[in-house]
Amino acid sequence: MKSGQAEIVETSKGIQKSGLMSRRIAILEFILRIVAFFNTIGSAILMGTTHETLPFFTQFIRFQAEYNDLPALTFFVVANAVVSGYLIMSLTLAFVHIVKRKTQNTRILLIVLDVAMLGLLSAGASSAAAIVYLAHNGNNKTNWFAICQQFNSFCERISGSLIGSFIAVVLLILLILLSAIALSRRH
């Protein structure tokens, strides 16, 4: 009879450790979602408010650089805004994972949606990165000149918004891995 009780005690301790680890993963997932939200919304706002005007010869002739002059940068803003909206809405499910233990279906749903948002965000960030590269370096073969020597503030802001977006890409990858780890621990 004693050996049966010892097995039950050992099993219940294992369940408690597993539950504690699942709760820690859920809390970390919640925090990462908040950090990723601030990165994506910050990137969208920074890029969306980027514009610089330079006078040319006289005050009546000016050159302007705005994010919406290039479709890739507009796509970047939209992608970051969509992902930040998703991250805010997913916080409710992430909170449920902290409170409840049996959350397999919602974890699978979040993994699928996280992968979709990762694809959208990485597409937006990659397309904007190509434009930022051209703005900094130009392309001699096609006679596209680097504009960052003239539009320094514009280039600093769009480069900064890219950094925040790529940090959010890494955070989404970590969220997917954490959800997969949490699912695998249940089986």
Curated annotation (Swiss-Prot):
Transmembrane intervals: 25-45, 75-95, 108-128, 162-182
Chief place of localization: membrane
Extracellular side, ranges: 46-74, 129-161
UniProtKB keywords: Cell membrane, Cell wall biogenesis/degradation, Glycoprotein, Membrane, Transmembrane, Transmembrane helix
Taxonomy, superkingdom: Eukaryota
InterPro entries noted in UniProt: CASP/CASPL, CASP_dom, CASPL
GO cellular component terms listed in the entry, alphabetical order: plasma membrane
Pfam families registered for this protein in UniProt: CASP_dom
Cytoplasmic side: 1-24, 96-107, 183-187
Subcellular location: Cell membrane
Membrane topology: Multi-pass membrane protein
GO terms (BP aspect): cell wall organization
Role description: Regulates membrane-cell wall junctions and localized cell wall deposition. Required for establishment of the Casparian strip membrane domain (CSD) and the subsequent formation of Casparian strips, a cell wall modification of the root endodermis that determines an apoplastic barrier between the intraorganismal apoplasm and the extraorganismal apoplasm and prevents lateral diffusion.
Annotated protein name in UniProt: Casparian strip membrane protein 5
Annotated source species: Arabidopsis lyrata subsp. lyrata
